[in-house]
């Protein structure tokens, strides 16, 4: 045999030795009362105009400014959800969703209607955008919310249950009672509060509260509200967009870098850290961030594996969830919550303070 043939044989034997074994990942977990439940909430945060215009964001042009294409997100979510009925996704910004909806065939629209009615795809917040809560007049907040909700009601015959103002800089009591409780939301979640307030709330487990925003309406217009422990991002090392560098969960023992034990350990420890600052045995992880899920399979493939192996390990229980499922789970515990009145204003961010200090002092 010549060198070429020998080499070829080695490659062939090498390929045959990498056993490929089909694994059916068990993603069917539901809430387990006696354990820490990690609610994995798959989401994207799509600013309706920020570094690019709303049109550029939708079609994915001018990607040198920011690599962001919202129609890719919505296009890729549909097959990813159809591939496993346990997977879930939330979508927020109606300015993008309605644009995409108008571009779809009747067949796709019917599939999406089924995903919404089965609860796999949940439309939350439901306004055209995630409005700022400090500068706009409340009439405009009502109008832009109404416009989005009307469409959702007409097309899907559902009403969004959850307020999801994860990126506005600080939060107003008006948002809590008028654009939250009075809209009919069951809960309201957000990412940005003053960094000192957040630190204190982590210490005394008061990130989640009952928020009574109106003095005159009192408890008749209160709402369950939660600030996230960090931002609206996943825990460290759990980012799975195509170019993200979080370590993948490599579960084929015949390949290099098998790491199931290590990655499960990291997952469990992040869950316990968050449980330590949270009332009840339910914690929510926001699995996504700005303009993510442009290729949704990369996220779901990893989350499928985590759910499978973390639950096999058994120290905590991981599940595909939504903020509605999380809210119902919190409610079912009968926990009593700290009371919050007035605003989450003024807002200061520690990162920004540091940058100001470095560049302007
Ligand atoms: C966006 O892309 C278009 C087409 O390539 C180009 O003409 C325009 O200058 C770009 N805009 C910005 C702000 O870079
Ligand atoms: C849990 O919280 C307590 C008090 O807030 C803190 O002292 C402790 O280090 C935390 N433990 C873990 C594992 O995060
Ligand atoms: C919560 O309270 C309801 C009504 O009193 C009761 O049926 C239920 O068992 C309680 N749940 C827990 C987890 O204590």
Model-predicted segments: where are they?
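Cleavable N-terminal signal peptides of Sec/SRP-targeted secreted and luminal proteins
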Residues: 3-20
């Amino acid at each position: 045999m010549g060198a070429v043939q020998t080499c070829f044989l080695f490659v062939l034997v090498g390929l045959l030795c990498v056993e490929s074994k089909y694994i059916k990942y068990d993603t069917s977990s539901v809430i387990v009362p006696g354990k820490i439940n990690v609610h994995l909430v798959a989401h994207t945060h799509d600013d309706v105009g920020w570094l690019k215009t709303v049109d550029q964001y939708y079609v994915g042009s001018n990607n040198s400014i920011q690599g962001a294409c919202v129609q890719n997100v919505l296009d890729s979510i549909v097959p990813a959800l159809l591939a496993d009925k346990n997977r879930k996704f939330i979508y927020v910004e109606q300015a993008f969703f309605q644009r995409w909806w108008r571009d779809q065939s009747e067949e796709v629209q019917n599939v999406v209607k089924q995903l919404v009615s089965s609860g796999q795809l949940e439309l939350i917040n439901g306004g055209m955008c995630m409005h700022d809560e400090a500068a706009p007049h409340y009439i405009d907040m009502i109008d832009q919310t109404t416009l989005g909700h009307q469409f959702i009601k007409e097309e899907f015959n559902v009403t969004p249950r959850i307020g999801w103002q994860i990126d506005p800089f600080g939060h107003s009591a008006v948002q809590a009672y008028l654009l939250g409780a009075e809209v009919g939301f069951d809960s309201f979640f957000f990412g940005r509060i003053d960094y000192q307030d957040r630190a204190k709330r982590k210490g005394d487990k008061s990130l989640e509260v009952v928020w009574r925003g109106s003095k005159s309406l009192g408890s008749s217009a209160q709402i369950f509200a939660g600030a996230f422990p960090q931002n609206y991002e996943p825990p460290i090392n759990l980012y799975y967009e195509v170019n993200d560098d979080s370590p993948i969960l490599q579960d084929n023992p015949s390949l290099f870098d098998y790491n199931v034990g290590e990655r499960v350990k990291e997952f469990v420890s992040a869950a316990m850290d968050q449980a330590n600052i949270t009332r009840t045995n339910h914690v929510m992880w926001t699995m996504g961030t700005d303009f993510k899920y442009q290729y949704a399979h990369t996220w779901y493939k990893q989350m499928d594996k985590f759910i499978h192996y973390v639950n096999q390990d058994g120290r905590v229980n991981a599940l595909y969830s939504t903020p509605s499922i999380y809210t119902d789970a919190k409610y079912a515990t009968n926990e009593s919550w700290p009371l919050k009145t007035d605003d989450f204003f003024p807002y200061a961010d520690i990162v920004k303070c540091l940058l100001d200090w470095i560049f302007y002092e």
